[in-house]
Amino acid sequence: MSIAKRVQQWATFARTWHIYDCTWQNPFESAKLVKTHLLGLQKPIYHPMNDCGDHVVLINTREIALPGDEWVKRVYFHHTGYPGGASWTLAWQLHEKDPTMVMKKAVYNSMRGNLQRRHTMQRLHLFADDQVPEEILQNVTNQIRTPRSIPQRLDHIDKETLENFPNIMDYPKDYILR
């Protein structure tokens, strides 16, 4: 067996660590991407009864972006198990309490119908910001590409770039913008 084939085989059977930046990403679109790596769907040895998934580290879950008015319309259900223990929490309230919970529930729900999803969720590591412990970062070997590009905010662009940006119209100096 050649060295290249041997390395490819090791990579297939080993658990790889991936990192994913959730900044300005839709958690439900991101959950589909993360699910493929957690379950090992991208590996040639995948089988539903085979536990061949990888570890995924999600950073900046505080910066997720829900589409439209999902923050005020999406409701999460929880039951304590006691009579009258049902509670419904809005997405923005849940995100305020725990910035990782909306993303965690999105990934959990994307694996619907999988009997091993509770065990699989143990390989998901969530962080509200980019402060990740060093022992976890040492294991990371791959970065998952985000489906959306992150737009640059106007207040983060330096003045020199703004002044050199081409103008569509040159207004006269005495023109008043209303």
UniProtKB/Swiss-Prot annotation:
Pfam families: Ribosomal_L13. One of its GO terms (molecular function) is structural constituent of ribosome. Keywords: Mitochondrion, Ribonucleoprotein, Ribosomal protein. It is found in: Mitochondrion. InterPro entries: Ribosomal_uL13, Ribosomal_uL13_bac-type, Ribosomal_uL13_sf. One of its GO terms (biological process) is negative regulation of translation. The keyword Ribosomal protein applies. GO terms for cellular component: mitochondrial large ribosomal subunit; mitochondrion; ribosome. Belongs to the universal ribosomal protein uL13 family. Component of the mitochondrial ribosome large subunit (39S) which comprises a 16S rRNA and about 50 distinct proteins. PANTHER family: LARGE RIBOSOMAL SUBUNIT PROTEIN UL13M, RIBOSOMAL PROTEIN L13. This is Large ribosomal subunit protein uL13m. The gene is mRpL13.
